[in-house]
């Protein structure tokens, strides 16, 4: 699935690790910029604190009562962080940064396998330096841990899908990712990975896709992963008097899928239809500043101009089912769509690593320029909003937050200058990432 060899800089494992570490440090520096302001941050942090205080690592609790909202993996990790750093906001958020760093490195490995090392490198930078991941990578939320586990399974499948014969190695990594994703956020991880595997296998040519026996092996490994999850879930449900099943699965999984909860989503069928495409603007804002690449990427992937068929199929099988699943769910929150972001980042990386194709195809060049001007307009509006916050709220914003948003403006301008000068999308993308860092 790799593209043909290219001349010029080809980032390796060392460069990818250094970039992942740099973004991780950047996210850690952002953490003290604000107190725990999201309601979920306070819930999760308190549940982790109570685990430490009570020694009950089986059943999460909040204010002494069963807290059946989510499985325990993130609470376990937060509790470990509290034991090292003390009970404070930084400790509550700490786990998210390295988890996001792991996601970035795995995205590089996936992009390297599907397209080229430079495509993978741009993809990891695009993922790590978009608005949504900057927020979730510096917040006491569960999403960064979930994303890392999803990316682990996706990377293992990318290697197997590309013909790697080390089935038991990558099959084991696939199962570990599935198990961790379930311990992080229940069935969300498998709901992303299973369609990715199914569609990219079914629609691949029979001569190039993994053998059917390997698919049976992955199914058995997934059952083992489910068994690992049940090894926690069954005792926890018994200890909670059935609350983990009734509330955790019945309300917070099945209930959220079919009914808008806590005002997150439209009420009634009219409200449901009105909110159906809410994730389109969420992606446009959340993937900023890399939304500049999406019009050209979607056009290039749809027309078969970027990457080979296997690579495009892999990305489509990740992006489309994930987007459709969260779109159809009744309850909608912006961070729910995060599992689709690595696929978007892979598209961005593939575009940035294919300057010859983009500049040769007038339609792709047009869409890239369109994305740029939308990017500039949104950047200016965002910077204006950030600068206006002190006047509107009466509170000063932390310097890391202000610097991060200011850097986005410089980054967008740096990228477009390189594109307009036809100096190469890869060089421009690196200028953007450097300015943002």
What are these regions (language model features)?
Residues 13-19, 107-129:
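Transmembrane-helix signature of polytopic, membrane-embedded enzymes
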Residues 46-49, 176, 180, 189-335, ...:
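Transmembrane-lumen/periplasm boundary regions of multi-pass, lipid-linked membrane glycan transferases
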Residues 25-26, 43-66, 73, 80, ...:
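Extracytosolic helix-loop segments that constitute the early lumenal/periplasmic catalytic or substrate-binding loops
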Residues 106, 145-163, 344-347:
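Specific aromatic-rich, kink-prone transmembrane helix
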Residues 94-114, 152:
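Transmembrane-helix motifs of polytopic, lipid-linked glycan transferases
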Residues 1-27, 217-224:
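Start-transfer (signal-anchor) and selected internal transmembrane alpha helices
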Residues 118, 153-173, 181, 352-355:
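Membrane-interface transmembrane helices that cradle and orient dolichyl/undecaprenyl
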Residues 138-146:
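Short acidic/glycine- and proline-prone juxtamembrane loop motifs at membrane-interface regions
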């Amino acid at each position: 699935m790799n593209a043909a060899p290219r001349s010029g800089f080809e980032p390796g494992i060392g460069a990818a690790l250094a970039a992942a570490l740099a973004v991780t440090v950047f996210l850690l520096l952002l953490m003290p910029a604000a107190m725990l302001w999201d309601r979920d941050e306070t819930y999760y942090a308190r549940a982790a604190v109570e685990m430490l205080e009570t020694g009950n690592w089986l059943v999460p609790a909040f204010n002494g009562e069963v807290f059946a909202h989510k499985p325990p993996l993130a609470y376990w990790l937060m509790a470990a962080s509290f034991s090292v750093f003390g009970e404070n906001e930084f400790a509550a958020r700490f786990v998210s940064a390295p988890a996001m760093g792991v996601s970035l490195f795995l995205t590089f490995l996936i992009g390297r396998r599907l397209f080229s090392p430079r495509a993978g490198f741009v993809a990891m930078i695009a993922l790590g330096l978009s608005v949504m991941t900057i927020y979730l990578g510096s917040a006491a939320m569960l999403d960064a841990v979930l994303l890392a586990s999803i990316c682990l399974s996706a990377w293992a499948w990318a290697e197997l899908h590309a013909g790697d014969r080390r089935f038991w190695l990558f099959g084991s990594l696939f199962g570990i990712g599935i198990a961790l994703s379930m311990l992080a956020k229940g069935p969300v991880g498998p709901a992303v990975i299973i369609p990715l595997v199914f569609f990219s296998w079914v629609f691949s040519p029979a001569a190039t896709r993994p053998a059917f026996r390997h698919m049976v092996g992955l199914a058995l490994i997934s059952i083992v992963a489910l068994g690992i999850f049940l090894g926690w879930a069954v005792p926890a449900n018994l200890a909670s008097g059935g609350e983990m099943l009734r509330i955790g699965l019945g309300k917070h999984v099945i209930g959220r899928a079919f009914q808008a909860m806590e005002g997150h989503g439209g009420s009634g069928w009219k409200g449901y239809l009105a909110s159906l495409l809410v994730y389109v603007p969420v992606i446009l804002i959340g993937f900023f500043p890399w939304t500049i690449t999406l019009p050209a990427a979607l056009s290039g992937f749809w027309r078969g101009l970027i990457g080979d068929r296997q690579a495009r199929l892999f990305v489509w099988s990740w992006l489309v089912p994930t987007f459709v699943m969260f779109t159809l769910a009744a309850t909608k929150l912006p961070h729910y769509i995060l599992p689709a972001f690595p696929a978007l980042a892979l598209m961005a990386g593939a575009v940035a690593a294919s300057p010859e194709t983009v500049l040769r195809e007038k339609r792709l060049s047009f869409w890239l320029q369109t994305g740029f001007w939308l990017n500039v307009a949104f950047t200016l509006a965002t910077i204006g909003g950030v600068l206006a916050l002190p006047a509107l709220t009466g509170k000063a914003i932390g310097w890391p937050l202000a610097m991060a948003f200011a850097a986005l403006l410089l980054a967008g301008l740096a990228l477009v200058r390189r594109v307009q000068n036809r100096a190469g999308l890869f060089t421009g993308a690196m200028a953007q990432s450097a300015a943002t860092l």
